[in-house]
Amino acid sequence: MFRGYRKAFVFLTLVATLTGLGCKGASPEIAAATKQKSLQIWGIFDDQDAYASIITDYRLAHPYVNVTFRKFRPEEYEKELVNALAEDRGPDIFMMHNTWVGGYTNKISPLPPVVNLAELVISGTIKKEQAYELHAKNTVSVRQLQSAFPDQVVRDAVVTSRTQDGKTAQQIVGIPLSIDTLALYWNRDLLNAAGISEPPATWGDFQKDVIKLTKTDAQMYIVQSGAGLGSEKNVPRATDILSLLMMQNGTVMTDDNGNPTFEQMPPGSGDRAMVPGAQATVFYTDFANPNKEVYTWNDKQPNALDAFVTGKTAMFLGYQYQLPIIQARAPKLKFGIASAPQAGGPEKNFANYWLYTVSKKSKSQDVAWDFVQFMTSDKEAVKYLEATKKPTALRSLIQDQAEDLDLGVFANQILTAESWYRGADVAAAEQAMNDLIDDVLAGDKPQDAVNTASQRVAQTILPKSNQ
């Protein structure tokens, strides 16, 4: 992150010459600072190998720090994490989804202005000498975070809190390595057969292509689907797709304090028969409405990802993390990846990512935050990204991935990717959005359905200014 990160050190004068990597003859301060420390990172998706190069680099200057990564299955991770933190057996550093911030602020030690720790320094030209120096290092500021990362990271990772003297302060509670975005996977053979030369760039073209690509039998059962969307039970991340449509349609998802506003008519939206959030919901559910020309999907279809993998649906809105799943399950499938369709206004995409944060109960908070900053610097982050084949979160690395066949589409979307605050109970908020889809499909008035969903989401909200 931060190319100038190491230039921000404020060096103290406590230096001890070492024998090898030991601390013989060191001052009490050096001896205490270089006592062996173990940092444990908890997360999902990655193995220890993904961080191996970064850990090796960090230990060159901090040989007294051992770093290990523990991988969990996605379905078990949050429960294990919450229980471990409550029982004081949790990790020093853990991965936190960008939508979890509201529910985790009381479990996090925010990034302090300065971290204090010892670093091994090698000096001399002919006779090399090793010495530990105690450093008081300035940490990343909100301005530096804003400069290095997309705007959505600042909205998610910076929390306004009250200090003991009653003033407000902005604090960083996490830093990402990668940002994923929704994109359009498309089956080349099926689009070719339908005479469609390129994937749709707008939702209007998407509708037209869906009509061309959908095939039914004599009993009107769907034999080939144009796209796997319209419902929620068998569409992975249906609430993200709906949120993307809402935001592209001009919906303001929340106010400045995080309270839901997607049921409202935004200022300056002109004469509309329906609020944009309700319009977007109708647009989405039309694909699963048998009375509509764009009908292409229903709850009897398989999971949308499975349908795409088996060639039964032509288009699938998904994330980069699903790419290796598709490649592994269907190595002969001819498919492409295109940017998410747009609604005609300013480009907007949907962000889905994880932040690395430090537990309030860690006994090595300064070292833990120093490692998080080191890991998310552009020099080190690129090693993780190359090992995992994930899209970057850093502005400085976007161009490096822009022409990559697998990552280019996703990397090019991160600067326009947005998300929205879902309070302290993300599961409850997402269930409210899923039920919104079901209610409209069941025939409820769209405005009534979005009103109900907004009221339910509001019950999960902790005001951002008081977290």
Place the predicted regions along the sequence by residue.
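Conserved N-terminal structural module of periplasmic/extracytoplasmic solute-binding proteins
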Residues: 2-109, 113-130, 136, 198, ...
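Extracytoplasmic/periplasmic substrate-recognition and gating elements
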Residues: 194, 267-271, 289-291, 315-322, ...
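Glycine-centered hinge/linker elements that transmit conformational signals in sensory
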Residues: 209-215, 247, 251-297
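C-terminal capping/gating helix-and-loop segments adjacent to ligand/active sites or protein-protein/ligand interfaces
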Residues: 43, 386-396, 402, 406-463, ...
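Short, solvent-exposed loop/beta-turn-alpha elements that line the ligand-binding surface or hinge
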Residues: 114-148, 231-232, 251-278, 328-329, ...
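Short helix-initiation/N-cap motifs at beta->coil->alpha
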Residues: 71-80, 203-208, 295-309
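Hinge/lid segment of periplasmic solute-binding proteins
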Residues: 100-181
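Paired acidic/hydrophobic, glycine-rich loop segments that form the ligand-binding mouth/hinge
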Residues: 92-95, 314-318
